[in-house]
Amino acid sequence: MTGSKIILASGSAIRRELLTNAGIKFDVITKPVDEAAIKASLLNEGASVRNIADALAEAKSVRVSAQNEGLVIGADQIMTMDGILYDKPISLAEAKNRLMKMRGKTHYLIGSVVISEAGHAIWRFMSKTKLDMRPFSEEFLDQYIEAEGETILQSVGGYRFEGRGSQLFSKVEGDFFSILGLSLLPVLDFLRDRGAISK
């Protein structure tokens, strides 16, 4: 093992938890990226959701990589439903309204992971998961929001799939880790190939 330094360019608690639980030693370094401006510019150019997620993940990764040695992991996730792109809800009221719209419907999570070194992207992985929400009652939703609190504001969908949020769904097609925001298994494969972690 070469012991290449691994850096996570994300403040996401669940991404940190996934890497930690996998036994990976890493540092967390984040640099602000104007996600709204990048997204607006790409939408104006007619970019696909996949390209937008990829550009955001790359921007986060490259920005940190330009000033720090090692392999820098950047990630982004975008939710789409009925052709509309969604950002993280900013309040519990907004989260409730969104979840009410989502019940009984299908939405997609488009994810990208980009690993950079010396200021350049050297690896990327895209994921797409399809999630069907069950037609839950408003009473259930109120209980869910009360139990979860503001933790649901950390997710673009307004749910923590790894927790009580799993009760919102009737069917899911795709990778569990990708739903949480980091396609962990492909990332681990790349880190092994690079000798950053043991084979």
State the predicted function of each range.
Residues 100, 112-116, 120-124, 128-129:
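Anionic-ligand binding region
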Residues 124-198:
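Active-site oxyanion/phosphate-handling segment shared across diverse enzymes
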Residues 19, 57, 76, 95, ...:
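Residue-level signal for inorganic ion chemistry
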Residues 80, 114-117, 134, 171:
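Short beta-strand-to-turn element immediately C-terminal to the catalytic PLP-Schiff-base lysine
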Residues 25-36, 114-120, 153-166:
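Mobile beta-alpha loop/short-helix "lid" or hinge segments that flank ligand
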Residues 1-71, 139, 146, 192, ...:
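N-terminal polybasic phosphate/anion-binding patch
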Residues 15, 78-81, 86, 116, ...:
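Short, active-site-adjacent cap segments at secondary-structure transitions
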Residues 77-107, 133-135:
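Active-site-adjacent loop/tail segments of enzyme domains
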